[in-house]
């Protein structure tokens, strides 16, 4: 287990995150758990689980119970931290400063209109939902041994209403 890469949090670099983030990340580090392990234990997708840690997704009552058990955090305390609604989108500056997050922003900046055009041709006038939405990250290794990140976005298509 000592060879595992773990995402941690320096809360001083992220002052806009909710107080729950520091508590969750501290317990995660103490238990030496990856998001994949935590997600498996609570029955959620690892990106959705990480979003709870960053205050960008709502934890269900069942999530809170399971997170409490997995991370060893008092249930009532964790419930008090996570029972509200997320204040999404305030956790970082814009454009993002972190290189990986900036590259995700850059992908949308560079290919956004191309995505839009292709989606409009396939589905008509509308948008892809980020609410009726799921995402996942997978790792692929090619024949030369190079690692590739495979990010999948799956959003419900919402046609614009005519009125």
From Swiss-Prot:
InterPro entries: Cyanase, Cyanate_lyase_C, Cyanate_lyase_C_sf, Lambda_DNA-bd_dom_sf
Sequence similarity: Belongs to the cyanase family.
Keywords, comma-separated and alphabetical: Lyase
SUPFAM superfamilies for this protein: Cyanase C-terminal domain (SSF55234), lambda repressor-like DNA-binding domains (SSF47413)
Biological process terms in GO annotation: cyanate metabolic process
GO molecular function: cyanate hydratase activity; DNA binding
Gene symbol of the encoding locus: CYN1
Catalytic residues (UniProt): 103, 106, 129
Lipid metabolism is among the record's keywords: no
Broad enzyme group: lyase
Listed HAMAP family: Cyanate_hydrat
UniProt protein name: Cyanate hydratase
Reaction equation(s) it catalyzes: cyanate + hydrogencarbonate + 3 H(+) = NH4(+) + 2 CO2
Protein role: Catalyzes the reaction of cyanate with bicarbonate to produce ammonia and carbon dioxide.
EC number: 4.2.1.104
Superkingdom assignment: Eukaryota
């Amino acid at each position: 287990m000592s060879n595992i890469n773990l995402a941690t949090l320096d809360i001083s670099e992220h002052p806009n995150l909710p107080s729950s983030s520091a508590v969750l990340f501290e317990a995660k580090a103490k238990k030496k758990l990856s998001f994949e392990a935590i997600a498996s234990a609570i029955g959620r997708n690892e990106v959705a689980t990480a979003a709870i840690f960053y205050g960008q997704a709502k934890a269900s009552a069942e999530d809170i119970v399971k997170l409490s058990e997995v991370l060893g955090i008092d249930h009532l305390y964790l419930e008090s931290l996570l029972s509200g609604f997320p204040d999404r989108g305030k956790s970082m500056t814009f454009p993002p400063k972190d290189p990986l997050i900036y590259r995700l922003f850059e992908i949308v900046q560079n290919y956004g209109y191309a995505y839009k055009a292709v989606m409009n041709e396939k589905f008509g006038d509308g948008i892809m939902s980020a609410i009726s939405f799921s995402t996942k990250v997978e790792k692929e290794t090619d024949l030369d041994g190079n690692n590739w990140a495979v990010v999948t976005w799956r959003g419900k298509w919402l046609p614009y209403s005519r009125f």
